[in-house]
Amino acid sequence: MIMSVMASDSARAVVCTSRPFPKQKLRELVLQALYALEMAPKGEDSLVSLLMTEASVSKKNVLYALMFCKAIRANQSELDALLNATIRTTTLANLTIIERNILRMMLFEHQQNQESSPIPTAVLIAETTRLIKKFSYVEGSSLILAVLGSIFDQVAQEPASMCG
């Protein structure tokens, strides 16, 4: 299986995997890596062994998750601008680190999949709910789901470009 991830507009990382890594587990690893790097931005070297131990996954899978993490971080300013423009009752900075990173990760995945093979928004919303229940608190889910729902609805309503 070959997957590509946009790290920025000019760079695309291509990763070959022999066996598909479960997307749920991948999202959990990416979320944990995003959290760890926000807490200790210089800690990427120790992060590989920590995630291997804590998540019981191979080095290859951790490196694969870190590739997604780096792509999200490379696009963080654009993601945050869209999120801040959508959030009405507070700011992105006032959310917990986990909530911010769930929003960034799911928005990034939604944007990336619009270009290749779209994942239904219902699946992304269900996965967001699962991650909130596992890593955050349920009370925060309504804001996160409302923000993502609003963004996903805007994208769905945009007219497709016409070739002339």
Swiss-Prot record:
GO cellular component assignments: cytosol
The UniProt record lists the keyword Nucleotidyltransferase: no
Signal peptide positions on this chain: none
One GO biological process term: DNA-templated transcription termination
UniProt keyword annotation of Transit peptide present: no
Gene Ontology terms for molecular function: RNA binding
SUPFAM superfamilies reported for this sequence: NusB-like
CDD domains with a match to the protein in the record: Terminator_NusB (cd00619)
Keywords: RNA-binding, Transcription, Transcription antitermination, Transcription regulation
Entry's family note: Belongs to the NusB family.
Known role: Involved in transcription antitermination. Required for transcription of ribosomal RNA (rRNA) genes. Binds specifically to the boxA antiterminator sequence of the ribosomal RNA (rrn) operons.
NCBIfam families: nusB (TIGR01951), PRK00202.2-5 (NF001230)
Name by which UniProt lists this protein: Transcription antitermination protein NusB
Organism: Chlamydia muridarum (strain MoPn / Nigg)
Gene that encodes the chain: nusB
